[in-house]
Amino acid sequence: MDTIQKRYGYTGQGLRVNLTTGKITKEPTFPRFKDEIGGTALGYRVFWDEVPPKTQPLDEANKIVIAPGPFSGSGALCSSRTSITTIYPTIYPMPMIASAHIGGDMAARLKQAGYDFIIIEGKSEKPVYLYINNDNFELRDAKG
């Protein structure tokens, strides 16, 4: 394992969820995100690299990036934050990229499951939700 893989606070992998195909794949955190610290920076890097200019909130090219910071799950004070980066339709006067932040235990749970980020892309034909239990992950029907 080289030095870049030994970064503390990172699990070394994330998930990419394609709602169009239903495919979920693991992706390495490094070396791609070696210069980004925290969920917001990681989210903006994904948008810079992958989302075309002038993408609208409901376009299939838009993505949702869910990413906690490196201290999440460590017990450090104020570290249980998760960043959700996307092109939001509610930003005035026009839709634009932004990050919302949530607290609670989602950040720690995502790290405990072994993931630094989730990139959601595409569009599903029906309502689905992402089920994650450590190395088991799948899209499930949300209609019940």
Enumerate the language-model features and the residues they cover.
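Acidic carboxylate diad motif detector
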Residues: 1-144
